[in-house]
């Protein structure tokens, strides 16, 4: 469990809520599945090593990115910068790059590369070394 904004979140509860929200989005759009709006999964490496708050932020970054179209392969480079979590979110086609600096409260800074891949039936978040 991680403390974020003075609230304690349970990993399993967060994942169930995220899946429920995605299901609602699919129903709202008449069952039509849009890129990254299908079932979502995280690999063991992500679940064990990437703080849940960062997992949720990365899913949200994919959901809210303003591009003409989303590439099936999203890249997140996470590092530490001046005591804060730095996240560089990018995709290849169409070209997209956005940098974020986040001050985390109670969650450790994660350093590494994470991919989010959509294969039209589900979306998976995995560490680069699990690819």
Language-model features and meaning:
Residues 94-131:
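Short, compact, well-ordered microdomains
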